[in-house]
Amino acid sequence: EMQRSLVGSEMCIRDRYMDMWKAAGVKVIPVVASVALARRMEKYGADAVVAEGMESGGHIGEETTMTLVPQVADAVSIPVIAAGGIGDGRGIAAAFMLGAEAVQIGTRFVVSKESIVHENYKERIIKAKDIDSTVTGRTHGHPVRCLRNQMTREYIKLEQEGKSFEELEYLTLGTLRKAVQEGDVKNGTVMAGQIAGLISKEQTCKEMIEEMMDQTEKLLGRC
């Protein structure tokens, strides 16, 4: 049987699950959007936490990476991994200065040559401008960052009309699959962070990592 060595989760992890994973020798690294949640995860036994700012794509919190990371770093003794709005060496170097020991990068790697998302999805991110992302779901406490399109315009319109959570949820059923697998970037959910405007080309993961680390090392060498 395959043995899992690491669990990462964007959902609030309960202590009973943490105990089960730890007993199996699994490293647990939950994603947190607040200091309180970071402290709770440390108390439960997390090996590290990902402090994710609202600049990231997908489900988000209310704090920015700039404000969240240093506060989490001061509040816990376990390693802090910064996420949200990081897409090059400048973002990595900044995260280290804020107190992070590592970074988590999502949106840039979505457009890597190894990524299996639809080419239309990649192209939409590459062509995105700095102001092309929007947040849906705020009215019912489930904010999600994605790129603007026909679906987000319809969703926000219904939000403003006061539609129920169930009605809004029905609108989004299957829309992530529609964008990721079918390539419908007009009616699907194109989850991507605000850093999308910085991405201009498709590269291999190796090329991305080498480019980012070279830039990071040069910047930190100035300190």
Regions found by a protein language model. Give the residues of each.
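Conserved functional loop/turn residues at catalytic and ligand-binding sites
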Residues: 25, 45, 85, 99
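Glycine/Thr-rich beta-alpha phosphate-binding loop at enzyme active sites
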Residues: 27, 31-70, 74, 112, ...
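Conserved active-site-proximal phosphate/metal-binding subdomains
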Residues: 67-81, 87-223
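Short secondary-structure boundary segments
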Residues: 10, 53, 107
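Single conserved hydrophobic/aromatic residue that forms the stacking wall/gate
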Residues: 1-13
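Short beta-strand/loop segments at the ligand-binding rim of alpha/beta enzyme cores
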Residues: 19-32, 75-83
